[in-house]
């Protein structure tokens, strides 16, 4: 395991490859889905996978048991692919009823004679009853944790027998559901298998590393009290010498504890996620041995102060970790709760690591063990939620919750990646309705506190959070002082400042009375712009607001981490790093600062650059101080006492030229865990209207880039009528506003954005501009002319259609808009599926050329579009921008313009490729360019 983990840490798979694999590796109809053992953390050698085709029948009127279906004969003609929930596309069965019956033949191998045989269900939602050859084996009520029934007395080894399963998933207000509105988990949704066990099998083997990491405590539990004296043996199979330890369990005992010294044990960490492989065997005279292969990570989870401060942080092995997490809804478009292949499940974890995150929050879903296994192997922390119910806080609901909580901790105790258990989310299911009010009553708060204490009694080695709070609710007893907030990017700096000022031991902020803050790490546990704008955003460029938030977080070291919503899109939220099909989204960062990626925004060594807005305004020639803040959240001493800061300042001007302004190199102080403001950069602005980018690189002494960042400055002023180009050519300049069209017609729609900032035409059609010949310009002095414009294709988004459709139901339960472009704030972010168009340019009736328009993009490159956004709770095509078109104007068209006194410039989109056209003005898009004619002078 260790060797694989190291290889994986050194090799980054292309994310495009990972995304394409999502669909490419779905199971074939003739194969067994998910053939791997579902419990790498607890597996026996003799097992048989029961995934695959089962007979299936719905039971809408609950008559199947009376009709004798338990004996194995279901109505003929239907089948389902296990372990996919009915209703999930991969199951092959539509969601038509609340009760489903499964049946199949099983054959226990002859070689299993003399052993106890069990059928094991990874998870089945919700009330599951099982029969073998008509004999009922038992019933399990719960949808998220494993259970098993013994077949031994009924087994006819080597012969076919009928296994029948009935699952009742009838809705109840107390039933745990989480966000199954994205796709219901109905019936069996994890691997089902047969397993041969010894005479008194192990029920659990839990490893608890000692605080000094020099040994491990081991707690073993048997399924039944020992019928005679038994011996338990542990063998550490990948430790030098394969050491073994043994303990005796006396007759009648059902548990054993061992303290095993492991001096100089290899530790588990995010950088080196080593796993200790262990074989546990229990045996006794005349009793078949039971052997389980398992593993653990030698690591501790605790809370320590950030060195040099009294700010509490989560720590792994005593070293603070600045948490950079993503909310993982853990949904697959074809399998819902169940991912089609193990490699796709692995890649979910790998994606997070590749963009520089150090953890995921498995959101109100108890995730499949193999996903946790991959987190263990790849070194990604897991915050694990218990699913919620949607009804009232009654005793039935709390019983369901406790059953799931106990099962989750029992199953997942050995996963070193799991650092915290989250009991409740946003007080869902905990409020009592009285009229129009939803109240979080003291009795519910006390119950939540008791659940926290229960979890701590079950697992004292991890952090426990009572309630991941939001929306005015507070904590009770908790190990983490977390909070949710969804804000526009411009509000983050003031918000985090206020929270930092109110975070201290004894503070009442973020807690329900009479509870108070103690020494809990303060962290954000959900953020994003998705709910930061009125009515949600739909699909938008999240990267600009994200950048502003991360800069704000890094300026405030009391904040011990953050958690972005979300890893991937779902059916009604589109703010994921990846889309629901796991195709990539483009941030545009690498076009602004060469080599910059999301990893730079997640770097342990971080320089926050510029003002909280990420864009400020200045006048031509003004000297501007650019603030710098160093957030060095690393204990590394490899860099000495200083690092190199390199700032490259460049600008785009009104002629569409990129001009280099300055390069500034300085040394900045370094010490481990340093958080401090640095001396600002003083930058002189260009003497003309421009978009200025201050691109910063943090380097070590060898020139290795450690982090990249940037800020922008909009230099205002009147553009020049005469100028000199970068190649020395002198030009006269004539311009017109983007919306100053003299004629236009579009097959679908035409509209403006923010008054005169941008002009859109959807479908096929044209815009026609008339640009006057410059006063006093002698035609004989003109050597040539070029038309300059920023343009893109223009998709007709759902919000742009003339429709009065409203969002439906509750977003948290799958409601809302299911069109990513329908929300009034939406403008789909640049991604892997471009929206092309093409524009034909004619000047005074003469063909000047055709240009391909690659896309209708929106990302961080739309600097001016973001700078133009009003602070009114809405977005107006934020981040959208075009490509810079330079179209030489034919001499005949220039001559006609000289005679007529104007250039008639027509931009046409043909109906053969009706991809629309957007024209950007000088205060919108990427470049400070209006539709412009450059007359090159002789």
Where are these regions (language model features)?
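Extended carbohydrate-recognition surfaces in non-catalytic/accessory domains of CAZymes
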Residues: 25-120, 171-181, 185-188, 306, ...
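Accessory beta-strand-rich segments of carbohydrate-active enzymes
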Residues: 40-41, 57-59, 92-93, 97-202, ...
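Active-site-adjacent substrate/metal-binding segments within catalytic domains
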Residues: 83-108, 112-132, 138-141, 199-206, ...
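Short strand-edge motifs at loop-to-beta-strand transitions and within beta-strands
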Residues: 102-104, 145-149, 254-260, 677-681, ...
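Beta-strand-rich binding/interaction modules
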Residues: 132, 215-250, 256-258, 623-668, ...
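Extended acidic/polar, glycine-enriched regions
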Residues: 156-158, 221-306, 688-713
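Low-complexity, Pro/Ser/Thr- and charge-rich linker/hinge segments at domain boundaries
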Residues: 186-206, 299-316, 711-743, 928-938
């Amino acid at each position: 395991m260790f060797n694989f983990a190291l290889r994986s840490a050194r090799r980054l798979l292309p994310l495009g490859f990972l995304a394409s694999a999502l669909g490419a590796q779905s199971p074939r109809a003739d194969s067994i889905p998910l053939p791997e053992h579902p419990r790498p953390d607890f597996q026996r050698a003799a097992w048989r996978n029961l995934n695959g085709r089962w007979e299936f029948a719905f039971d809408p009127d609950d008559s199947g048991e009376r009709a004798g279906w338990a004996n194995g004969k279901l109505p003929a003609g239907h089948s389902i692919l296990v372990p996919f929930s009915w209703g999930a596309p991969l199951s092959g069965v539509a969601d038509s009823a609340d009760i489903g019956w499964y049946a199949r033949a099983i054959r226990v191998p002859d070689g299993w004679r003399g052993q106890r045989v069990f059928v094991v269900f990874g998870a089945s939602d919700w009330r599951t009853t099982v029969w073998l050859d008509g004999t009922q084996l038992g019933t399990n009520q719960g949808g998220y944790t494993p259970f098993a029934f013994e077949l031994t007395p009924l087994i006819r080894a080597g012969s076919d027998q009928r296994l029948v399963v009935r699952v009742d998933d009838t809705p109840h207000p107390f039933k745990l559901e989480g966000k199954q509105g994205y796709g219901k988990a109905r019936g069996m949704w994890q691997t089902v298998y047969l397993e041969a066990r010894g005479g008194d099998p192990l029920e659990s083997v839990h490893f608890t590393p000692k605080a000094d990491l020099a040994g491990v405590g081991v707690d073993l539990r048997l399924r039944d009290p020992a019928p005679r004296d038994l011996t338990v043996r542990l063998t550490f199979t990948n430790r030098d010498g394969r050491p073994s330890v043994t303990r005796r369990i006396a007759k009648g005992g059902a548990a054993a504890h061992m303290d095993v010294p492991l001096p100089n044990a290899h530790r588990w960490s995010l950088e080196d996620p080593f796993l200790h492989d262990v074989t546990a065997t229990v045996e006794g005279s005349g009793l078949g041995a039971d052997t389980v292969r398992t593993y653990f990570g030698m690591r501790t989870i605790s809370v320590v102060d950030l060195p040099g401060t009294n700010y509490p942080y989560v720590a792994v092995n005593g070293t603070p970790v600045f948490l950079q997490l993503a909310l993982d809804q853990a949904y697959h478009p074809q399998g819902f709760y169940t991912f089609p292949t193990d490699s796709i499940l692995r890649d979910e974890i790998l994606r997070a690591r590749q963009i520089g995150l150090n953890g995921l929050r498995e959101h109100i879903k108890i995730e499949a063990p193999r996903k946790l296994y991959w987190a263990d192997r790849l070194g990604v922390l897991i915050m694990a939620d218990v699913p919620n119910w949607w009804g009232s806080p009654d005793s039935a609901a709390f019983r369901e919750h406790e059953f799931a909580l106990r099962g989750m901790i029992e199953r997942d105790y050995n996963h070193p990646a799991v650092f915290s258990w989250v009991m409740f989310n946003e007080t869902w299911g905990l409020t009592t309705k009285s009229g129009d009010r939803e109240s979080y009553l003291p009795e519910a708060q006390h119950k939540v506190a008791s659940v926290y204490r229960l979890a701590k009694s079950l697992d004292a080695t991890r952090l426990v959070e009572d309630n991941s709070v939001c929306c005015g609710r507070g904590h009770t007893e908790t190990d983490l002082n977390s909070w949710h907030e969804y804000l526009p990017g411009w509000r983050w700096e003031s918000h985090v400042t206020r929270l930092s000022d109110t975070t201290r031991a004894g503070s009442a902020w973020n807690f329900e009375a009479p509870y108070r803050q103690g020494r809990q790490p303060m962290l954000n546990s959900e953020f994003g712009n998705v709910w930061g704008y009125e009515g949600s955003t739909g699909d938008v460029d999240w990267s600009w607001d994200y950048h502003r938030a991360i800069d704000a977080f890094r300026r405030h070291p009391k904040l011990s981490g953050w958690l972005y919503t979300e890893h991937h899109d779902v059916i009604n939220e589109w703010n994921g790093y990846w889309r629901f099909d796991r195709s990539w989204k483009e941030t545009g960062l690498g076009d602004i600062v060469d080599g910059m990626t999301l990893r730079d925004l997640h770097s342990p060594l971080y320089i926050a650059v510029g003002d909280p807005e990420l864009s400020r305004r200045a006048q031509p020639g003004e000297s501007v101080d650019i603030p710098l803040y160093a957030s060095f959240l690393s204990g590394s001493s490899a860099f000495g006492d200083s690092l190199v800061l390199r700032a490259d300042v460049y600008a785009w001007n009104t002629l569409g030229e990129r001009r280099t302004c300055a390069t500034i190199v300085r040394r900045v102080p370094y010490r481990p865990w340093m958080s401090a403001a640095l001396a600002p950069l003083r930058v002189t602005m260009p003497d003309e209207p421009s978009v200025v980018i201050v691109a910063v690189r943090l380097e070590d002494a060898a020139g290795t880039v450690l982090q990249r960042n940037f800020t922008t400055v909009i230099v205002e002023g009147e553009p020049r009528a005469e100028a000199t180009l970068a190649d020395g050519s002198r030009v006269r300049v004539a311009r017109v506003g983007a919306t100053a069209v003299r004629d236009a017609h579009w097959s679908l729609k035409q509209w403006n954005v923010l008054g005169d900032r941008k002009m859109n035409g959807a479908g096929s059609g044209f815009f026609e501009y008339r640009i006057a010949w410059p006063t006093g310009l002698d035609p004989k002095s003109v050597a040539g002319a070029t038309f300059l414009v920023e343009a893109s294709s223009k998709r007709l988004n759902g919000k742009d259609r003339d429709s009065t459709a409203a969002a439906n139901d509750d977003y948290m339960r799958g409601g809302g808009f299911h069109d990513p472009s329908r929300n009034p704030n939406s403008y789909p972010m640049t991604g892997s599926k471009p929206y092309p168009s093409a524009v034909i340019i004619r000047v005074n009736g003469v063909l000047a050329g055709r240009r391909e328009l690659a896309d209708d993009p929106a990302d961080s490159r739309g600097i001016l579009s973001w700078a133009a956004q009003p602070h009114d709770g809405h977005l107006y095509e934020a981040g959208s921008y075009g490509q810079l078109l330079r179209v030489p104007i034919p001499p005949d068209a220039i001559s006609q313009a000289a005679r007529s006194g104007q250039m008639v410039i027509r931009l046409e989109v043909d109906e053969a490729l009706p991809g629309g056209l957007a024209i950007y003005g000088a205060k919108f898009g990427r470049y400070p360019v209006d539709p412009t004619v450059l007359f090159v002078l002789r």
